[in-house]
Amino acid sequence: MAREYKIEDYRNFGIMAHIDAGKTTTTERILYYTGKSHKIGEVHDGAATMDWMEQEQERGITITSAATTTFWKGRDGKMRRFNIIDTPGHVDFTIEVERSLRVLDGAIALLDANAGVEPQTETVWRQAEKYNVPRMIFCNKMDKTGADFYRSVEMIKTRLGATAVVMQLPIGAETEFKGVIDLVEMNALIWRDESLGAQWDVVEIPEDMKAKAEEYREKLIETVVDIDEAATEAYLEGILPDNEQIRALVRRGTIDVKFHPMFCGTAFKNKGVQPLLDAVVDYLPSPMDIPAIKGIDFKTEAEIERHADDSEPLSMLAFKIMNDPFVGSLTFARIYSGKLEKGASVINTVKDKRERVGRMLQMHSNSREDIEEAFAGDIVALAGLKETTTGDTLCDPLKPVILERMEFPEPVIQIAIEPKTKGDQEKMGLALNRLAAEDPSFRVKTDQESGQTIIAGMGELHLDIIVDRMRREFKVEATVGAPQVAYRETITRTHEEDYTHKKQSGGTGQFARVKIVFEPNPEGDEFKFESKIVGGSVPKEYIPGVQKGIESVLSSGPLAGFPMLGVKATLIDGAFHDVDSSVLAFEIASRACFREAAKKAGAQLLEPMMKVEVVTPEDYVGDVIGDLNSRRGQIQGQESRGIAVVINANVPLANMFKYVDNLRSMSQGRAQYTMTFDHYSPVPSNVATEIQAKYSGQK
């Protein structure tokens, strides 16, 4: 079967934003106008097509990125193929955003016209910067009270440090919002309310807005000619680019991430969505426009590139595992090069295992269509893979490659969980393993001492939803303990320890002596090991044993048994025995050496500090600040945002449990907050003593 759409007509993009900026609604409108959805789903009545998990429909927030393929006819009359990923905006699910950005070519960043750039907008924006994803901006909810397009433009500069190229101006705002001015064509688009936004009239720019439109068109031209020498020279000579040249320059600047074209509208009231879709075609990259993906040759370890070309060897990245009630486990993958046929055998180079593709599906939210073949640029769901997890590379067994791995954050909160009945015991283990395979930011472990099952994640909501899914999807009833903070330990001063391990009573003996300097790692939270052995006092083949021994005890610090961060170990001397020394003997010696040293090197307890942003009406500012201070919070600053006040603070996670209830009652439900992990910080000594007493009893 031949390719239906040329690869240059593909647009793989995501929609990213703060919670409640209208992502799912915007995606719903896109599906409606591109003909994939016959009825518009509304988030607040629980019928949105993209939000297909039960909890999403109940809570009105998007948890999993649903991948959807749809089609759109551009201004030139040609059909384009869109692969859209709808991502969650709640901070507990940033891992989903990170995963989808990794496999997209472009993104639309959505802003709420009333709130502008919000904390989670900053977080997802930074994630997109990390992967250098070209972005457009859609200022949504222009019909909302307090909507201010121009303030949002300013906030993009001050808060994100980015350049927004304004492509449209709003006509009216709040309830008076009628349409937009197109600054390229210099005309106005007014939507007809009775047509559900499917029809609009192209009219002249209103008289009272002509001067503003001229001013913003001039700014647009000044910004875009700046990226091209010939265009700059022509502009300085008084020759202005024509409309097609403007579009070409905007496209180039967007793909090179020099600036971000900005549009406006209200998805809920069906205004502004179609021009946004035209802009996706005009300005976001096709798989051909972005640099070839880099990887490591599986055999030679040389760096190689794979281009978006069907004739190159197959390479794809698994970016999401999802449990589907009808098909079982589904692996979502982005094909970077080559083509894939149903039933093909591929190799997972990360696990070094062969996999067979049983079924291949093209997804529309939660409905699906079987396909026989997929090509470079496609995003597909594969059934029948046994070994593959998120971040793995799947490729041609004859030309194996490992594509860049994804990095996943460490969980900051954990809870103990117990099955209610004996029957739930086995089902719970299976359910938790399935859920952990789907979500790399969720971890499951067994406490060695108590035998309890501990689950860890990115926040209270994250773990609530995991427990909820266990009940609904796997029919497992469980009792959940109180949330526990993921504390860490470190050392604060340099200490040299000399340790000899000897066991020479009958049979093969064991002997190893190590002299190691332990100190805080100046380069960060990682563990760093160095060997400065000269003259062979510890033979080369035993040195990995020394490193392994220390690493094996880093998971349990001396104070309260928490994992250790930021330790540097330098092996400076030692001794061995011709017969009795072994890698294992050096492993045992270094393990004991570190245990001894950790107590003497100023061991210190660390706690996760959260970056908290509270948005509150002015009347409650005093109460909110007082309350944050009482939680050992450090106020970093405050600023006005319209009629509200934004308070920024760093607060220990330990003191933020159930904060949402407190904030609601303090502000009569009018204040909101967001919280993201910021850094680990030393615990004050009085609090540390309590924590040690509590956890040492459990060690």
From Swiss-Prot:
GO terms for molecular function: GTP binding; GTPase activity; translation elongation factor activity. Keywords: Cytoplasm, Elongation factor, GTP-binding, Nucleotide-binding, Protein biosynthesis. PROSITE patterns: G_TR_1 (PS00301), G_TR_2 (PS51722). This is Elongation factor G. Coiled coil: none annotated. SMART domains: EFG_C, EFG_IV. GO terms for cellular component: cytoplasm. Its main location: cytoplasm. InterPro entries: EF-G-like_DII (IPR053905), EFG_II (IPR041095), EFG_III (IPR009022), EFG_III/V (IPR035647), EFG_IV (IPR047872), EFG_V (IPR035649), EFG_V-like (IPR000640), G_TR_CS (IPR031157). Belongs to the TRAFAC class translation factor GTPase superfamily. Classic translation factor GTPase family. EF-G/EF-2 subfamily. GO terms for biological process: ribosome disassembly. It is found in: Cytoplasm. The lineage of its organism: Bacteria, Pseudomonadati, Pseudomonadota, Alphaproteobacteria, Hyphomicrobiales.
